[in-house]
Every structure is written in structure tokens, then in C-alpha cells.
Amino acid sequence: MNMKGKPFENMNTSAKNRYCRTVCEFIAVSAMFALIALGFGCLPERVSDIYTVSAGTDECARVVVIDAGHGGEDGGASGENGLLEKDINLDISARIKTLLDICGVDAEMTRTDDRMLYDMYGELNDYRGKKKTYDLKNRLRFAKEANAGALISIHMNKFHQPQYSGLQVYYSPNNAESEPLAAKIQEYAEIYIQPENEREIKRATSAIYIMKHTEIPAVLVECGFLSNPGDAAKLADSGYRTGLAVTVSAAAAEWLASPEAAK
């Protein structure tokens, strides 16, 4: 979304708000129509729910940073079907960025290929024993330097008992707007792609480094359990990954259009 230049600068606050609301509504509606086109069972009457977006502000111009968790030698979790978390995270993150870019939201990715980010800024000559710490620190540094207004970190879950399944969102306790963003993503997941999902959002503990050390609205989306055969089979499917990306993108768009997101 290009908000620069005299035409936009010369708008009064009310006009800017209307403009931003229109753009953010377009994002949400476009995403939901994409979901229908992909055949994920989103009923037409449900799409109308997303047309009513709260009055927006020019805060919907904020950069959204999408963080594909893990990467490179850090593969994250793995499934019995051979799926690696790092690969799925990157794939879904790229789809989210594509959807947001098409609709005019400035979306940036912490990584666009299969690598850790510990040496992104070349701070040390020797990262032995420090790779994971610097990888996480640099993801936050990237978001800060991008002047991000929101951070969405994409991950996969795994548990030693295979019966657990479903998407779940964790939110940073450091910004009041993290929780509404998490709630919207969780809500849309249940409505549009996981009707059986009864999980609730959770406040991130201090063990989740990125959620602990950021001050901007931030959520971590555990898209499913690689330890669950059903989830793993879905996550191996390209169409289902697109459904996840559309769900997250549409939820983020409606959140961006809310007046609370501007605070």
C-alpha cells in the first residue's frame, strides 16, 4: 500500500480513514473469495460476515512481518511422513506474503530461503554455541528495522502423544493488541478450515523468545501437529496450506482495519 505522495498527505483524517478501511475491506473480502475458489468449504453466507469491518485508520498501512520459524540446520519438528517444520513454515509464510502483497499490504518475511538467520548482520566472527540465540535476536531486529506494526510467526506443533491436533495461536503479553489479533486468527481457523477445532488462544510464556522480547503486536501460529497423522496429511497438501495462508491473511486484514489496532 503506497500511502506516500501529496494526494494522500492532503487528505483529512476522515478521508484517510475511509481510504484505509476500503483497502483493508478489499483485502479481507479478496482473501475469502480466494478461499471459496479453492474449495475449502467456506459457505457464501459466511463470507458476508467479513464485509462488515470496523472503521479503520491509517494504521492499516503498517508493515506486517511474517516470520517463518526455524530454517537451515534448524529443521524444527518433523513428521512421520517426512515433513520438516522449517519447510512448511516457509511455504505458508510465502503464501501469506503473496496474498497480502496482492491486496496492497506491505508484508515482509524474515527469511525467504532455507537458512538460519544468526549471521544476518555479521555481528560475530564465530557463532559456535550462539547460533540459535542470534537467529532469534535477528528475527526481532529485522522486524524493528522494517518498522513493523505487527509480527506473525509461523510454526508447527509436535507432541509425543499423536491424538492432539489443530491450529493454536499464542500471543505476546507485551502489547494489548496481540490478543485480539490472535483471537481473530483462531476464530477464522475454526470457521473456515478447522470446524472441529476447539482450541483457545494462549498467552505466550517467557519460554517463547520472540513473544517475550517484542513490544509490537505479535502472535505465534502453531498451524497443526506434525505428530498427528491427520494434521500431517493436511499440511502435506498444497491446497490446505493455501487455506491456512488465506485464513491468516484475512484475519490480519480485519484486525488491521479495527480501530483498536491503531492504538
Annotated model-derived regions:
Residues 1-263:
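Catalytic-site microenvironment of enzymes
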